């Protein structure tokens, strides 16, 4: 019984803290490699971009990988490859964990309407303004509208007319089938100088 309790405690400690340490270091390393590659005028890992959310702190910057599967989300924030890219008309969808695997969206519920989100590529910085608070929209994990080209309930496959952003994470700190969602709209694009 004691061994079972110790084993369970060790597993929970690993899930809650160990994966944060390992993934956090890997995210920092990847971010540094991306910044260096761009400074050298090269591409970093294919389709890696950086995201900054000032509400999460002045130094908060995370790499965004392509894909939304468990392997990608265990490494960092993921981007839906079936939707728009940064700065493009359509829906740029980013998802990440609130707990474990670096906890990139730990403070998601602190987001406020009007907050800015910067998405940096090798060539430009795209700034989106959030339309709602992080606590406002909670959906079942099976809801598909946040992944649609126009992220609104009932919009279906409506054609987008503007560059949009959707951020998605778990609604609760511990396991839940609900997701918290915020959307934003592109307000600025600044090309980077060589």
State each model region's role:
Residues 3-194:
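Solvent-exposed, non-transmembrane regions of membrane-associated and secreted proteins
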């Amino acid at each position: 019984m004691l061994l079972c309790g110790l084993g369970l405690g060790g597993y929970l400690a690993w899930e809650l803290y160990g994966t944060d340490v390992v993934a956090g270091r890997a995210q920092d390393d990847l971010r540094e490699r991306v910044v260096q590659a761009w400074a050298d005028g090269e591409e970093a890992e294919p389709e890696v971009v950086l995201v900054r959310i000032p509400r999460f702190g002045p130094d908060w910057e995370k790499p965004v990988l392509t894909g939304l599967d468990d392997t990608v989300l265990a490494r960092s924030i993921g981007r839906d490859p079936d939707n728009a890219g940064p700065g493009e008309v359509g829906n740029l969808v980013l998802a990440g964990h609130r707990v474990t695997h670096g906890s990139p969206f730990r403070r998601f519920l602190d987001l406020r309407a009007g907050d800015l989100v910067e998405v940096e590529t090798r060539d430009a910085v795209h700034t989106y303004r959030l339309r709602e608070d992080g606590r406002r929209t909670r959906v079942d994990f099976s809801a598909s509208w946040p992944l649609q080209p126009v992220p609104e309930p009932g919009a279906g496959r409506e054609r987008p007319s503007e560059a949009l952003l959707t951020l998605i994470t778990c609604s609760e700190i511990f396991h839940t089938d609900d997701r918290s969602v915020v959307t934003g709209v592109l307000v600025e694009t600044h090309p980077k100088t060589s």
